[in-house]
Curated annotation (Swiss-Prot):
Belongs to the pantothenate synthetase family. Homodimer. The lineage of its organism: Bacteria, Pseudomonadati, Pseudomonadota, Alphaproteobacteria, Rhodobacterales. Catalyzes the condensation of pantoate with beta-alanine in an ATP-dependent reaction via a pantoyl-adenylate intermediate. This is Pantothenate synthetase. Beta-alanine binds at Q63.
Length: 280
């Protein structure tokens, strides 16, 4: 059965009030739509942990750096609802724009530290947009838990810090990245890749895993980074924004593996910006 679609905040809050009266818990899965198996894995995690699940779909204009990127982002509400039908989701919250940014809206949520590296400098204003809309969705829904993919690991850390700093009583749960058979991290942007580029993109994760194996064996990071840059360039990646080794807890930069860490990559292929990260 296709879940009901809610477009007004009052309708979402009415549902939440009914559940709270029963002492039921709510899991929130925030998305921008164009759902794939990665999103559906978050829904499964939410269903396993909570009495009720609401999936949100909102293409947030404030987290896009390019008007073209915003215009090209896929909008597939009907297909998304069909994909969610077998999962027993209680509702899909697809707020009208004025439910998130009403006339005269003047507040943004801005963080420092965790936003100062990687995606922060490369996408100015992006994390302000993310933190602002996610804070609103947390407060609007009153959810007990929210589920995010580790594919966007820096975003996960931003959301956790934001909720902690603003005393929003919600548990932010990170879920493992879901990958294609090739190892390519699932992303709504992948559908914009040509067949040839999709095949090339599938080589990114094996390169990262090979580098991680060498790091665990004691190799220094700088030579590995240079080698990976050359390999990606040879494969046809047009621009490599960063290949970073960072502490998994605070995202400080590392030059060798001396604590729990993650490797992060952002690069352009076939006009599409791809990001990935793995535990090391």
């Amino acid at each position: 059965m296709t879940p009901p679609i809610l477009r007004r905040l009052d309708d979402l809050r009415a549902l939440r009030r009914d559940w709270m009266k029963k002492g039921d818990t709510l899991g929130l899965v925030p998305t921008m739509g164009a759902l794939h198996a990665g999103h559906l894995s978050l829904v499964e995690a939410a269903k396993a942990a909570c009495d009720h699940v609401v999936v949100t779909i909102f293409v947030n204009p404030k987290q896009f750096n390019s008007p073209e990127d915003l215009a090209n982002y896929p909008r597939t509400e009907h297909e998304d609802a069909q994909k969610l039908a077998p999962y027993g989701v209680d509702a899909i919250y697809v707020p009208d724009p004025d439910q998130i940014y009403p006339e005269g809206y003047a507040t943004t949520v801005s963080l420092t530290g965790v936003t100062d590296v990687m995606e922060g400098p490369n996408r100015p204003g992006h994390f302000e947009g993310v933190a602002t809309v996610v804070a609103k969705l947390f407060l609007q829904s009153g959810a007990d838990r929210a589920f995010f993919g580790e594919k966007d690991y820096q975003q996960l850390m931003v959301v956790r810090r934001m909720a902690r700093d603003l005393d929003i009583p919600i548990e932010v749960i990170g879920c493992p990245t879901v990958r294609e058979a090739s190892g390519l991290a699932m992303s709504s942007r992948n559908m914009r890749l040509s067949a040839a580029a999709t095949k090339t993109a599938g080589q990114l994760n094996p390169l990262m895993e090979a580098a991680a194996t060498r790091l665990r064996a004691g190799e220094d990071y700088a030579p590995l980074e240079a080698e990976m840059r050359a390999q990606l360039s040879d494969l046809g990646f047009a621009e490599i924004e960063y290949i970073d080794l960072r502490c998994a807890q605070d995202l400080t930069s590392l030059d060798r593996l001396d604590r729990p860490a993650r490797m992060f990559v952002a690069a352009w292929l076939d006009g599409v910006r791809l990001i990935d990260n793995i535990a090391v």
